[in-house]
Amino acid sequence: MEKRDRRLGIRVGGLGKLIGVGCFIALGCSFAVARRPESRADKPGIIVRTHNYAGVKGDTLDRAEKETARIFREAGIDTAWVVCPVTSAELAQYPACLQPADIPRFDINILPRFMATQLSQPDTTLGFTSLTREGQRASDASIFLDRIKEEVERTHGSLTGILGDAMAHELGHILLRTSGHSVEGIMRAKWTPEDFRLASRGQLLFTPQQADLMRSEVRERAQAQIAAEPTAASLSK
């Protein structure tokens, strides 16, 4: 079990080192830098920042994140995870959330029931992304914890498994740049009881075609991010 205070650094899932000082049943659609090790530079990676509004226990969230990381590792994408605050007043306590990086970053908001209902999604929706049109590049998603718990109870499944798969599903929408779904795998629209059992056992995955598309998207975002960063020469002017 990880003991380090995750507010102070990035938990790495094969991605790199921290260097520094210190939509239906279903799913809807301080100065430090993080870098990939040279030996894995050809493998795309992302940083996922979690905002735990629902107050999921730390060890439960850790295991769910590791499940999401495993699913993306199977798809050829490394992940690093950062715990971020839920209020601006707490931001100074989470220096890892402010770290600059040349790696694409995404935010996942884990919401309690009263916050989830404000998004006006169907009662069977377990998650939601900020995509408003096909092909859009979004960067954040929300997960509805109470609805996931209801499915865990209904299917006698694993909370960490289903929560981890729900996060992977929503990140999948973002990286595939679509609110659409597939007929098989983790991007199915309506999850059956058997799908929830597979999720609990860690057997819902992205298809090879989806994995290819997501790796390309991560690389394109990383290149665009680097190109948009001001150079040392421009900063000196």
List where the protein language model places each region.
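Residues at or immediately flanking beta-strands
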Residues: 45-47, 76-80, 186
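Terminal transmembrane helix and immediately flanking juxtamembrane interfaces
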Residues: 29-31, 44, 50
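Bacterial N-terminal signal peptides
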Residues: 16-30
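Metalloprotease/metallohydrolase-associated module, dominated by Zn2+-dependent proteases
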Residues: 35-41, 49-66, 128-157, 161-162, ...
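N-terminal secretory signal peptides that target proteins for export/translocation
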Residues: 1-15
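A general structural motif
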Residues: 43-45, 103
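Phosphate- and other anionic-substrate recognition elements at nucleic-acid/protein interfaces
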Residues: 2, 31-34
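Metzincin-family zinc-dependent endopeptidase catalytic domain
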Residues: 58-167, 171-174
